[in-house]
Swiss-Prot record:
The keyword Aminoacyl-tRNA synthetase applies. It is found in: Cytoplasm. The gene is tyrS. Its EC number is 6.1.1.1. This is Tyrosine--tRNA ligase. Its main location: cytoplasm. Residues 338-399 form the S4 RNA-binding domain. It comes from Nitrosomonas europaea (strain ATCC 19718 / CIP 103999 / KCTC 2705 / NBRC 14298). It catalyses: tRNA(Tyr) + L-tyrosine + ATP = L-tyrosyl-tRNA(Tyr) + AMP + diphosphate + H(+). Homodimer. InterPro entries: aa-tRNA-synth_I_CS, aa-tRNA-synth_Ic, Rossmann-like_a/b/a_fold, S4_RNA-bd, S4_RNA-bd_sf, Tyr-tRNA-ligase, Tyr-tRNA-ligase_bac-type, Tyr-tRNA-ligase_bac_2. One of its GO terms (molecular function) is ATP binding.
């Protein structure tokens, strides 16, 4: 194996879970041509978070090595709904929902990928042309027994929970995408391994060289336990403000910090090892976290924004200064005042009044910079207060008496 190929393999392996089959992949690299690298995204959610960028970062790395990215937006498969890892049938999206969500992708992914080395494709381009007979022929390539080898299907089957026939079609359609695109390599999360292997088998069935497979781990959310997800509110959105991204990354544990650096940082392995040595020699992990947070903010905004976010963070948390860019909220009320727990909920600082009460009990609530311990406190109408939850959540709230009888909103 040449030194060039060994170097590529070393870079590509970084942070990945599994590379199948590595010997075949080395042979593809030895051909000396740009490989066709496929990654599919079902447009079920229009906003990307850092968990999505684990895969995008690896695609960018492959671009830097000279390879061609096939960024597949699964507008057709999105109407089926990916059952991977799901314990129940997932409701499909409408064509209108999918089109709307897909339109938001380009402006986000090209913050990471090089447009000139990226081909955006939609699997409806070939799947819309499939007849009923074509679908039946595709379904005939796999057995129900093979489908039940998937953990999620097997679990539901043995627990007597329903599996719809259309769910078996999802991995087949995703696999056929590899046939249509003549993919050399497909990337996916660890939960996608079965689907990726189906693509490899279908390519063999249709007389093509089988793709290799690169699986990437699922990034843990800010809680360090469950995978990053908007629904779990443990995510960092790439379109969030510089201050919000910076603050969220600074909130992760010192242990989770290294996991994030491994999967999200573009710094070299040598630099990361140097950082680890610094911490072992007594450097505060917070300093490393600051460097990493600046890198991520600069990637999705600018270097100037990263410096400003770091300065604001230092001022806000080290010196107790309230930031200037506080979101403003006007609440219309019928009465002469509003109970503090309700204000916190309506301002979007807590998900419920019970959470607000709990935060007050824990001493995590401030009004105009002063800690509040009175759970029954009433904020009078026609005043403006700066409400704060913890270290990162602020809102400038104005209460207005609504003469027309409109409720607080």
């Amino acid at each position: 194996m040449s030194e060039s190929i060994s170097h590529q393999l070393q870079l590509i392996r970084r942070g990945c879970q599994e590379l199948l089959i590595e010997e075949e992949f080395a042979q593809k690299l030895a051909q000396g041509r740009p490989l066709r690298v496929k990654a599919g995204f079902d447009p079920t959610a229009p906003d990307l978070h850092l968990g999505h960028t684990v895969l995008l970062n690896k695609l960018r790395q492959l671009q830097d090595l000279g390879h061609h990215i096939l960024f597949l937006i699964g507008d057709f498969t999105g109407m089926i709904g990916d059952p991977s890892g799901k314990s129940a049938t997932r409701p499909p999206l409408t064509r209108e929902q999918i089109t709307q969500n897909a339109d938001t992708y380009a402006s986000q992914v090209f913050k990471i990928l090089k447009p000139e080395q990226t081909e955006v494709v939609f699997n409806s381009s070939w799947m819309d042309k499939f007849s009923a007979a074509d679908v039946i022929r595709l379904a005939a390539t796999y057995t129900v027994a093979r489908m039940l080898e998937r953990d999620d299907f097997s679990k539901r089957y043995h627990e007597n929970r329903p599996i719809a026939i259309h769910e078996f079609l999802y991995p087949l359609v995703q696999g056929y995408d590899s046939v249509a695109l003549k993919a050399d390599l497909e990337l996916g999360g660890t939960d996608q391994k079965f689907n990726l292997l189906v693509g490899r088998e279908l390519q063999k069935h249709y007389g093509q060289p089988p793709q290799c497979i690169l699986t990437m781990p699922l990034l843990e959310g800010l809680d360090g336990i469950q995978k990053m997800s908007k629904s779990l509110n443990n995510y960092v959105g790439i379109n969030e403000s510089p201050a919000e991204i910076f603050g969220k990354l600074m909130s992760v544990s010192d242990t989770l910090m290294w996991r994030y650096i491994e999967l999200l940082s573009f710094e070299s392995l040598e630099t990361v090892r140097q950082w680890q040595n610094e911490v072992e020699s007594g450097c505060n992990p917070r300093e490393i976290k600051m460097r990493f947070a600046r890198e991520i903010v600069a990637r999705f905004h600018s270097q100037t924004d990263a410096v400003r976010a770091a300065e604001e963070f230092e001022a806000r948390f080290s010196k107790g200064v309230i930031p200037d860019d506080i979101p403003e909220k006007k609440l219309y009320i019928q009465d002469a005042g509003l109970a503090l727990p309700q204000l916190l909920k309506l301002a979007g600082l807590t998900a419920s009044t019970s959470e607000a009460l709990r935060m007050i009990e824990q001493g995590g609530v401030k009004l105009n910079g002063d800690k509040v311990s009175d759970k029954t406190r009433i904020i009078p109408s026609n005043v403006t207060v700066i409400a704060q939850i913890g270290k990162r959540k602020f809102a400038k709230v104005t209460l207005v008496t609504e003469q027309s009888g409109k409720q607080a909103n």
